[in-house]
Structures are given as structure tokens and as C-alpha cells.
Amino acid sequence: MTIQEVYEKIGGNYDHAVQIMRMDKMISKYLLKLTDSDICDKLREAAGSMDPAALFESAHAMKGVCANLGLDDLAAAVSEVTEEFRPGSGRKLSDDEVKIRLDEIFAKFETTKAGIEEYKASL
């Protein structure tokens, strides 16, 4: 499986990733690191407590990583939670609505992770 094929499989934006990382080797390196990172675990922990500061911090970190890797759908989903808990911004969603959004993020992350794991196994 090529890096382009994994992006197609996971619904990522390969062209965007190339603009940022410049080389397939770099894209591959950081895409593979995503599967070993605790970035989604931190968001899960924050979701468990519904702590606004922890939710903002963990969602903001995940959004940045996903955006830089061209994982646009995942970055957009996480961005909504980031903005919901941005300090100084008023809440627009109920806790139940936030939990629904978080469940969608976790499902997208698991799908993305599975595609990356398949890519990793093909190396």
C-alpha cells in the first residue's frame, strides 16, 4: 500500500499533507506516529470529566496534528469541539450534543487508525 492509497482509504487529503510535509517519507513517519500517540486518549479522558479546559487543550492539540497530516474530516470534527470550549467563547452545544460529537470523533479516529495500521502492516 502506498501513502497515497492509505490517504484514499482513510479519506485524508494527501495533497494538503504534501504541502505541509513536502515528502512522502515525512508524511509516513508522522502518520505512523499518530497510531502510537496518546492524543485521542487525552481527549477521551477530558470527555469523561467534561472539563472545559482539558477538552479545549486536548481537542486543540488533536486538531493541529490532524490538520497538519491532511486528515481534514477529522480535523474539522475536532475543530468544532475546540471552538465550543475555547476560553472566552460562549457555549453553543449542550453536554449531550458535545458527547455525540466526541463519539463521532472517536469513531473517525478509530477508522483512520485502522487504515494507518493496514498501511503499517504493508511496509
Language-model features: where?
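An anion-binding catalytic pocket shared by soluble metabolic enzymes
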Residues: 62
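Hydrophobic residues in alpha-helical segments
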Residues: 20-21, 47-48, 85-88
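Amphipathic, coiled-coil-like alpha-helical segments
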Residues: 1-12, 25-35, 39, 65-80, ...
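Helix-loop segments that flank and shape redox-cofactor active sites
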Residues: 41-54
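Amphipathic alpha-helical repeat scaffolds
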Residues: 18, 28-31, 44
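Generic hydrophobic alpha-helical segments
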Residues: 16-17, 42-43, 81
